[in-house]
Amino acid sequence: MKRQILWIAIVLAAVAVSSSAFAGDHEYVGADKCKMCHKVQYASWEGTKHAKATDDAKASTDRAFSADCLKCHATNASEDLPGVQCEACHGGGNDFKKMSIMKDLEAAKANGLVIPTQETCNGCHTGEDHSKKVVLADNLNNNEAIHEFKNPPPK
């Protein structure tokens, strides 16, 4: 009987762990951590509308600010991570932030790094109705400018 309970507990634990990994639950660390290695990208991002997205949404005089706005105007829908920071597109970085992991793209992806696609951008940048989403070509161009600089990992 004890063995059956033990096996059931092991199976349930395995399912819980695999479900958590599949869901992509990775802790967010904030752009200041990313800046430690990605200084050029951070400096390029810092002056963009993405960086100021939370402030801009709060300053809007024609719309009331709500928690729903944070889905696109903050990272991880949290005022603790204001603006559209690195992890809004690349996923929570706690599990891939170490240089030993980041120097291997496949290892970084296995630890939660998301390589954004157009669909990633479309999560917020589609449609003309601001009650849903808005397209700002300026923001999309800023995204390209941020990633124009490549910092290869040191050898």
What is each stretch, according to the model?
Residues R3-W7, A21-K155:
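Short sequence/structural segments immediately N-terminal
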Residues A16-S18:
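N-terminal signal peptide c-region/cleavage motif recognized by signal peptidases
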